[in-house]
Regions:
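Short, solvent-exposed secondary-structure boundary/capping segments
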Residues: 87-94
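Short, positionally conserved secondary-structure boundary motifs
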Residues: 1-43, 60-63, 74-75, 82-87, ...
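A short glycine-leucine-enriched loop at secondary-structure breakpoints
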Residues: 44-48
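Flexible, small-/acidic-enriched active-site or ligand-binding loops
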Residues: 94-100
Length: 122
């Protein structure tokens, strides 16, 4: 079983739609991905449909972190948990949409959730 720090993946430049400069004063010097949440599978972690998520590609993932990861050919926002007994990782969903957890030997981790910009709904 690989250490969490060994699971980091690189985003293919072809997958990046656009880039923006973010204020250093607010976000520091970290490399960030900005993605939009789709669906309500992570509401238990404060992530709702339409929220803007800031993902740090510089931070090392730890068990319990919410990460952007790829498993079974799909990319997800999930909490990553280590199952040392089985030598696997669990990508845990927590929301109103009852999604199954994913157990995998080697997920590709793109980064760790750092900030959430909430969508205002009147």
């Amino acid at each position: 079983m690989k250490q969490l720090s060994e699971l980091k993946a690189r985003i293919d430049d072809n997958e990046i739609q656009s880039s923006v400069r973010v204020p250093q004063m607010l976000f520091g010097n970290e490399e960030l991905l900005i993605v939009y949440a789709v669906g309500n599978g992570m509401t238990g972690f404060g992530i709702n449909d339409g929220d803007t998520l800031f993902i740090s590609t510089d931070r090392e993932p730890k068990s319990g972190d919410v990460v952007m990861a790829k498993a079974d050919g799909q990319t997800f926002m999930r909490q990553i948990l280590v199952n040392e007994e089985r030598g696997t990782y669990i990508l845990h969903a927590n929301g109103v949409e009852k999604r199954d957890d994913i157990e995998t030997a080697e997920p590709e981790v793109f980064g760790v959730l750092t900030f959430i910009l909430k969508k205002y709904a009147a």
